Amino acid sequence: MIYDTSTDVVVSAVAALYHMAESSHTMQLSVNFKQANHLVQVMHQCSEWGQTYIMETLLFFTPQTGQEAHMLADALSRHVQVHSPTLALTASKVAMFLMNYISDMERMNALGRWIGYVLMPHMKAPPEILYTILTNVLLYIQRRPMVLRLELSHFFCTYNDPEYIKLVKLDILYQLATQSNATDVLDELQSCVTDINENIARKATHMIGRLALKWSLVADPCVAALKTIMQGRADYALQESVMVVKDILRKYPDRYGYIVTMLCDHIPSLYESPAKVSMIWILGHFCDRVEGSTDALHDYTLSFLDESSDVQLALLTATVKLFLRKPKSGGPIVQKILHQATDLVANPDVRDRGYFYMRLLTMDANMATAVVFADAAPEEALDLIQQHVLDQLILHGASLVPLLQQNQPVMMQKVRHRFMPDSPALEPSARPHASTHMHAEPSQYHTMHDTDDEAVY
């Protein structure tokens, strides 16, 4: 019936096959190249819903060669009508799927440009639709960072953007940042720091710090921007700045010592536990360079029993570092903290850490120094999602799955998992998690909840 002369019959047959394949746990729909190519050829004669069903069904076609994937992608780009966001999102999802089977970089870049051409006209869509588009774009950029080089200006925040739009735009700007455009991204982030919305300002401040970690070329202007933020009157921006400065100092320990002195002036203004943890880490790790670090850590010990467990753990490590660097002045402080941690604190993690440090300090000072002053370089891939998770999310694109990925166990109860089908043309990086069919679980089953695999770089 898919070869019928009536497009209504073709679409009805395709829709029936698609719904049966999605609802049945025994049926595995398979489309060959001849069938897929025919469906693409008649797509321009179909309604919007008909085109959507056809493109969803194309995901059941597994290219056996890169040439098949390229030919189908080329036909798709010529016959699909992308005047609506639904068609644009579905077409871009199919293009991202086919890209896994194309090894020619020039063809991949051309397909990436086409995806941008398809999606960018809808950047002025209503906020709810725009959020859906932006969420999918963020997944695409993370999966193919070297292919999807989209224009930054499309993702600059405007005054009337809702909060949820601005937040995802900031994520996209960070992912799009390169050495050549990092300065432009920093300028946009700085303008967002002054936003009246606290969540936007915090997010922008956090992204400035991440940008400094991502590209050392703009680390100096990023730190200068953070310095300006800390001199402002927004307490919440100060809390966030301290947290990102800690990570910057971990990566560039010898470059920005001057900013630690400024941080010390703001210690009384730090009231959030993560900010306190960051400040305590800085005081302990750079105790031999920071004037007044001993007094500052002593002040924190006065409220040790009233602090959260995170702050207590950070203070334990910081006082041990102080003792190893300055045994005379740090001795009384570390003895007091270890006593409180092991005898007065109810939290088992804090007690265990206290006993660990007591035993470590009695064994060998050199060993203790090697342990507590171990390489503290920050994790730079925290913003990335593993490749197999990205593939699963993208295969579910143009649906609620990418939007609700933080609540996967609930949303996936009535949605079949999708996996990358294996073939000789599939790129090697996707093969470890590939399956025999899009709905067939791989031999080594990895879901969107797994976090033990390598990230996409």
State where each predicted segment sits:
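HEAT/HEAT-like alpha-solenoid repeats
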Residues: 1-2, 28-42, 67-80, 105-123, ...
